[in-house]
């Protein structure tokens, strides 16, 4: 019993010994199994039933856990079979290396469990400093010792055993079972050390605990089945723990610890030294030379080189206490060495992915930027170049198995974050990984190209459409074959016609579909997908990147030469250049073998009788004309393309192959340099110098009358690549610039100029379909490109939505596009109509056409070199274009502000600085630095969870904004949660309104971060590329807008002098003609002359004797034509010259062809009256200066501008105005609901756009960088412009007025303090109360918005919109406007009339000013120059506001022009940094300034207008800022006549101003400027009539629209003349 009990105990527990008579008997599990099986066999004899029962028990067995571990070890420690694989090991002779090792994973695991336990102790006791590892392969003993806190040597009260015996000798015991406790240790499941004990023949635990003053030692043997009694001793020293064990090698099928397993264990010792911070590791008595994780990584990368032979660069970052990361380049695919709580996770896991994903995400961004090959790079491909080392501490990690090779815990449970720094990523992108990835990409691209884009020599090839292959191509005579590449199918037909002469055996033809790819800058993907390139390679038999240095290698080609056959124009030259570039980039050696040649055809043929001359360049033809006296007798035919030649001519060309075939010869490195210069992206600055030198050379040649250089003379048989690039291709590059970059003079590109020329010539009185007009342009102006591009040009010229043109030269009759899609929503050109705008001929007076230099194309007189408008249109509508070497970008500026500056310059004053301005833009434009601006939209906080966006930055289109900004904010992404909960849209085609809902917390956060920034309502506008063609046709870079304005002014003033000379001559001739006619009639009536029954000769002789002159007008015109021909013989009109020269003798037809009716009394009186009128007109003209003529044109233009814009405002209101009630007088009422839906909420709090110091610093850095980088290039670009070196003008309007602020009720307007140097152009705030706000223009509309924004000094203070509205309403109440007149004027005033009113008014500093006017429409005081439009903020009276609140709301929406214009006053403001110094923003009224301004204005007005002074409504233009008040009328809202509080006259005054405006709008009503008008204006602006001073301030704000009153009538020089034909030229 005792024995069996002992055995049972031994078998079951394996812990104690059995009883017996003496020694200790050890019974193992296997002994029990053997004994049981023997017993079973003996008992099975003759016992069948029993046998069956025992067999079931054998099948279904229950094992103890210890038995299970020994029976199925792979479940716990991994395989116990030898495994061979690549592993990192540490060998004494080689160090750390990755080699093939054979080891038993189970043995490796039990060693690692003890090792990790030792490392875990560091997390329990930070004072632990040492781990000692001893491995004795000979005696098969392994020992691991560590100091630090030992295991408590105390008896466990529940289990009744000592704690060390419990945790090392009993399964399922651990200190890691409390999952609520966050631990960063390796132990987790309670198996680790026990598994080592179970698989050891001997396992000894020693530990000492200072706390309990005892040491403990106990030994287990025979796979933990036998144990000795623990030895407990008193202990006073330092704590320690030591585990010594002898692995049971038989369980691992091993005989001893071989070299491989020892190397692996040694590596783990090094792992511990690297991953366990602050612990020194001793191995076999020696301290390991590893000091931290970075030192450990060096064991791996030491002596390793990258593909370029450079040592690997390791990037290291200690992210925090728990994360240590190193990164370097991997050449063997992705590699990782990682540790979790000192456990070597050899298979990685989520912690590695967590780090690698961050690195890959950043690196792939860099790769994509630098990847020129076009190969798609995916994250896993980037990962393949990364070697990452991660050492981390994870709370309660989980693994996919007990072997702990792969960590599976989700990142969110790590207990810490590893956010790598930008410094780390920057270093990572420079450590060789990027270069390695790009090299791989390049290799892959090359492989793909070699596979797809190479060809081998075949006698026949298939699958290439339109190829006419040479019969001998690909055969033994292939080197003698030539492939003719033609420009298009029509040219191929010409070549095929010619093949009839030279045969098809050695010549093949292949048509190109246009310009081929510039392969030098193309991506791999582009080259792969380019059918043209692939076809050429296949046809010729080229092998990609193969060298053809050896002439023998050429035999592998199907063709020995390529002949390029293109049109003789500049685009044809470009195609030749691209083909040369294609061959040079890929097979440069082919150029040395004479592989390329070209086939030239005549561009002009001159024939006479049977003689025929061919010219291959225009300069050559011009030279011939110059030296051929009777060239007019020759028939001239121009050949614009190969398609012009007939089949007969084609045969003639090929018959004379020697003349038409030009060989390209390689002359050396200079040829390579020339080709690279023309096509390499790296040679941008060199190209600029190249083109600049060409333009300068051309200018000098023209000045000195020298002919232009040309190729292809009669003796030309070959040319070098250098000559081709510098004499032919450069013409294309220059023409590319001419097509892409506008002229400073008229702001037009050639295509636009052709459209304008055609429209002027057609002079349509009715609208014409855009598609039809495009055809007419192509016909009348010799346009040689596609008509589709022409139609788009016409559409662009007519667009007038916010962000397009400030002044559209064509009318958009139909859907020409809106701000919703940025014009892309325009209807098809077949469905829309257009015609000249009434402003076009006022901007480009017809009388100036006689002074222009018209060009000739195909011997056809086409558009002039440039038109000469009365203001610089390049500033009005801006410019944008990218050419060769240069690009141009110029924003729009306010039309009225430009007009005012021109007037100032005419008066000898300096122009005011100007800020960009876009018509109808209601946001703000603020100056950030020199030529740098910030464009801000408008956003209001309506309540605690609602914001309202009422304006977007310039050229941020509504639909795009919704899709790219609001939708992502609403839906959120994986990384970014949704910011807003909902939004609604209330836009029209002209206005913007998003009502956005968000939670109160998120709104508070967004406001703290800056609503403009969060909602992306700020964009930057940089004007550092103001490159334009000057009047001499040379590109010039302008530093400031003032430079452009001054250069234009000088040229335009000179042309006004020329115009006066021309008019004096023409009017003199007309006067003489009329005088002769009148005298003849009178003498005939008096009987002094008899013409009856006399011969023609006698009549002419008689007239000559009596002093009559030959037709004076005809003679004068002939004299002008002759002078023009002498000046420019090449462009002389042959037909006109020959016609004029054909007649000889005096011409008296103008007298003798008069009808008999001319002798009647009425006709005689009419003729005399006409004669006298012409003489007076001539005398008047002689008394006027060039400046006077210019001022008259400006006045007429401004007057018409008022009418046009008033009509536009009326059109906007179409459909919103109800029908008038029968019998009621007054304006019809607005459909209020429709308006309110699209209007800004009256209760919003405006958020003022902020310019942060960071934005300014960034702008300064960019400026410095630009100055450093551009020093040389600027010198190059500007080598011919010495006159201007100005710096960007400082603020035109220090601050933009916050419309919200302007609406404030307080008498004192709070001004937004601007940081020094910051100028703001603000459109009227979107607050309903301020009409101006409504006027705010989109960043792209210049005119009105500019003036207003400049004028308003925005107060940083945010004022609730509703109060503003009330004020505005009150102000409106002041003005009663008839929709017909006042309202129009109001609109005009809003735009410009504010200025007028202001000019006329004398303003008092009165706290109560028309809110709406003051707030929204600053008016210029009379003191300001007439031209001033700088807005002054007057303080609105709250009561007025309330009355007119509603009206103003409407007004704001529709007062489109937001003027941030600067007037003279404005400039003063700008000059002074102080807010008050600026009249516009000074306290509501600055009387002294105003008076001065008034005097200036009056003087200016006198000087300005030769026309009656009343037309000088220019002040109204200033009033434009009053737009707010006017806006009501604009919208058709009846304005209340109630006089402003206490000042009925104020209302009157307002009315007057309104009437003036109306006059402008309604040509029939023109109110002369009278004192009363001024009064009314006062009233309009303020309740106080004293507001005169204020006026000036406001005027500047609303860019004064020159009042129609100024010069309502244009001076007509010939209008009264009966002989209209003589003046046709002016029409």
From Swiss-Prot:
Residues 741-1194 form the Topo IIA-type catalytic domain. Transmembrane segments: none annotated. Residues 1339-1349, 1436-1448, 1462-1471 have a biased composition (Basic and acidic residues). It catalyses: ATP-dependent breakage, passage and rejoining of double-stranded DNA. Belongs to the type II topoisomerase family. ATP binds at residues 117, 146, 174-176, 187-194, 402-404. GO terms for cellular component: nucleolus; nucleoplasm; nucleus; ribonucleoprotein complex. The record marks 882 as: Important for DNA bending. Mg(2+) 2 binds at residues 567, 569. It is an enzyme of class 5 (isomerase). Residues 1296-1305 have a biased composition (Polar residues). The keyword Coiled coil does not apply. The active site is at 831 (o-(5'-phospho-dna)-tyrosine intermediate). One of its GO terms (molecular function) is DNA topoisomerase activity. Its cofactor is Mg(2+); Mn(2+); Ca(2+). Residues 481-598 form the Toprim domain. Residues 1131-1144 have a biased composition (Low complexity). It comes from the Eukaryota. The gene is TOP2B. The record marks 515, 518, 687-688, 749, 783, 957 as: Interaction with DNA. It is found in: Nucleus, Nucleolus; Nucleus, Nucleoplasm; Nucleus. This is DNA topoisomerase 2-beta. Signal peptide: none annotated. Keywords: ATP-binding, DNA-binding, Isomerase, Magnesium, Metal-binding, Nucleotide-binding, Nucleus, Topoisomerase. Pfam families: DNA_gyraseB, DNA_topoisoIV, DTHCT, HATPase_c, Toprim, TOPRIM_C. It comes from Gallus gallus.
